[in-house]
């Protein structure tokens, strides 16, 4: 499995791996939902699409916070994650649906959306210009989007700590900043240029900084086990043997322990929040 998972990876093994770690991922990333949903400006009933919805946690939170009469549709390329989202969605709630979709090839919806939102779902497209041009067609004229991406590696030590620990026991290739991956848009100007080229207007990017509870608030040893199991770089240990895995896990646990308070590891994070609109 690549350190830089592309869309095809998420449709297969990467999606399965993420589903297996939803118990820790969703509470860990939940703090990002607050600024993300606030930026949507849900001030009246509207149609909302959650792009790269994963297991549906953010989608369900949007429905809880949206005005009565709103509808929320979640889309993801991973069959495993859509299956999980459907399993947790209320069967008697017609205002929320989940569907399998590859945004780079999916047809433009007949009825466009008033809001588009994505929490860490727009960094993995194989052909970004095509994908963002498609997304522009998903948004109604005058509609608003909010996309979250990770800031720089230096400002997200919970992820760089994993790379450092793994690199102590095996050779880790240099990260390709142009490839699909979590830090693809660490330089926010890259995504702003793509969004501008896709025809979006009123573009802004603001940074959210806060502490994330690793694995949902696990102690250091358990957090290290979770992080290696959940991360794409942890997958590079496959085939290295149990001794290498144990060494990387112990090294990571020691790094995490420096950030443990009250029995839980919490580490700083920086997230870019991009907003804009479709002219009209």
Where are these regions (language model features)?
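Short glycine-dipeptide loop
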Residues: 68, 139-144
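Conserved Class I S-adenosyl-L-methionine
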Residues: 3-9, 21, 26-29, 55-57, ...
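A short SAM/SAH-binding and catalytic strip from SAM-dependent methyltransferases
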Residues: 114-129, 151
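A short acidic, Gly/Pro-enriched loop at the edge of an enzyme's catalytic core
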Residues: 104-116
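Conserved class I S-adenosyl-L-methionine
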Residues: 1-46, 57-61, 81-84, 102
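A structural alpha-helix within SAM-dependent methyltransferase catalytic domains
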Residues: 37, 60-63, 132-136, 163
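Class I SAM-dependent methyltransferase SAM/SAH-binding core
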Residues: 47-106, 130
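Conserved catalytic/acceptor-binding region of the Class I
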Residues: 129, 144-216
